């Protein structure tokens, strides 16, 4: 997440929730690019994602490497003047978290329908919740809604 001064968005005429996609200019063992949302929900925050093996590679190099990659990508589109607008930046290291192993759920092509099978409990003793099984997958609100739905199921099973 990058926080920019409001002048950045005005200077480049960026409207709220504009998508940003980087162009991959070279072939490598895996693509090196990012995508994001600028002026997220009309705030002065912009959010970016990298994925796959490249995300893991960046994490090994540390938070600064992820931030530098995104900033360099933005510089190639907006020029070096963006530096004067930057307030602060933060990158997560979810891939290093042993409980998550990453931060974005996705399904293999043609397999998204299998998310529904995760909504079923195992013998009404083990229940699953989270953004990966929500119809609003890859979102915090999807995780929240899924957790609430699962809590209701558990309450019914326990007859509370």
Question: How should each PLM-predicted stretch be described?
Answer:
Residues 11-160:
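Conserved flavin/dinucleotide-binding core of flavoenzymes
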Residues 1-13:
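Central beta-strand plus flanking loop segment that forms part of the substrate or channel wall
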